[in-house]
């Protein structure tokens, strides 16, 4: 089934349900016969005491070396300390950089400038919405998520919102190129430029400029509040959405919830040097080890990864097997209305792959 090329991929199990769903994803990928040399590296809360950090250098070294990672979710404490690292793509910096979470550290240290998340309806998956076929392109390096904030006495807290022309153009070009290469009809820039006239205004200006280079792709723009209202009212009006960092974080979770939940939406963080494939959802430590987690989102991220690796046949095989098992509704996890465990659901997909191959 798979090709003869041995691909090197970094596997980051993650926290909580991470080891279960990365293990499930690995099983279905290997069932296709694709040859992958997995570099398994651990980070997150599980290694903090041993390593003195949630993101050891060897994790970033591995992803830099392989260029591709399949990553489980991480526990991100509310509040608490920032993650400091001297690691950069060009060697160790004299002064460490601080990031708000291990997820943010991996993305920004590896210079992944764009996050792509997909939300699609699946036959057999309960949802209040139909006709959802949305791609969210999220700028990933700036906005208020640069974590530049400070207190002024005890009564004020200030956060800096940064939007640059270069990062905005990178996200916009990615969105239009994705639309062009995947038969998408429209790109919508999402913003709040009526209030944030300088920052979101710059983002919108750049998107408009980039749109002129893709005349075959329809372009429009909407304010963030109108966008979320429109998504829940008429999701079929939307195709590819491009937006600054914080809006993208929120809208991608909304769209995932519209197609069956966070367990159904795959994603990837993409940069010039690396691509990190992950699910939209968190680590869910409350159900860790119970064998009940839905691994579909990460499995679909694995499908995206296979396509990047040039293993199109294997990607299509995994995707078809997932869709058929979901449609049959015999072996689906409890969040989708079934009774199957994570391992039972995974085994059903593996068996389907064997039958389809």
What kind of feature is each model-predicted range?
Residues 1-5:
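Short, Lys/Arg-enriched N-terminal segments with co-localized hydrophobic residues
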Residues 9-31, 153-225, 237:
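Glycine-rich phosphate/diphosphate-binding loop of Rossmann-like nucleotide-binding domains
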Residues 15-18, 67, 137, 175, ...:
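Buried hydrophobic positions in well-ordered alpha/beta secondary-structure cores of metabolic enzymes
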Residues 25, 29, 207, 298-306, ...:
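Buried hydrophobic packing segments
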Residues 35-60, 231:
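N-terminal beta-loop-helix "entrance" segment that forms/cooperates
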Residues 45-47, 57, 230-333:
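Glycine-rich phosphate/nucleotide-binding loop
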Residues 49-158, 246:
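N-terminal glycine-rich phosphate/adenylate-binding segment common to multiple enzyme folds
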Residues 141, 147-189, 193-196, 312, ...:
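Glycine-rich phosphate/pyrophosphate-binding loop and the adjoining helix
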């Amino acid at each position: 089934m798979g090709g003869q090329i041995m691909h090197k991929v970094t596997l980051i199990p993650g926290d909580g349900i991470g080891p279960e769903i990365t293990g499930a994803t690995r099983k279905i990928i290997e069932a296709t016969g694709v040859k992958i040399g997995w570099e398994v590296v651990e980070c997150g809360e599980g290694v903090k005491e041993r390593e003195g950090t949630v993101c050891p250098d060897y994790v970033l070294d591995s992803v830099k070396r392989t260029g591709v990672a399949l990553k489980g979710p991480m526990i991100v404490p509310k509040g608490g300390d920032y993650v400091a690292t001297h690691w950069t793509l060009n060697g160790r910096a004299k002064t460490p950089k601080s990031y708000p979470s291990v997820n943010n550290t991996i993305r920004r240290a590896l210079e992944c400038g764009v996050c792509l998340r997909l939300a699609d309806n699946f036959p057999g998956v309960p949802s209040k919405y139909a006709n959802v076929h949305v791609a969210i392109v999220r700028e990933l390096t700036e906005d208020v998520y640069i974590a530049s904030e400070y207190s002024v006495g005890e009564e004020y807290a200030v956060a800096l919102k940064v939007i640059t022309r270069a990062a905005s153009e990178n996200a916009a070009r990615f969105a239009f190129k994705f639309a062009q290469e995947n038969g998408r009809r429209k790109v919508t820039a999402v913003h709040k430029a009526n209030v944030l006239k300088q920052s979101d205004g710059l983002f919108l200006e750049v998107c408009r400029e980039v749109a002129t280079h893709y005349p075959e792709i329809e372009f429009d723009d909407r304010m963030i509040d109108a966008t979320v209202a429109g998504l829940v009212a008429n999701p079929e009006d939307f195709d590819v959405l491009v937006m600054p960092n914080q809006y993208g974080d929120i809208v991608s979770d909304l769209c995932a919830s519209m197609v069956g939940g966070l367990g159904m939406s795959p994603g990837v963080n993409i940069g010039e040097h690396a691509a990190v494939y992950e699910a939209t959802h968190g680590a869910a430590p409350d159900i860790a080890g119970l064998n009940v987690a839905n691994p579909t989102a990460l499995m679909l991220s694995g499908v995206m990864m296979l396509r990047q690796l040039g293993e199109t046949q294997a990607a299509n095989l995994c995707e078809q097997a997932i869709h058929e098992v979901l449609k049959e509704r015999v072996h689906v996890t409890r969040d989708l209305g079934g009774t199957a465990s994570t391992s039972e659901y995974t085994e059903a997909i593996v068996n389907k792959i064997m039958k389809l191959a």
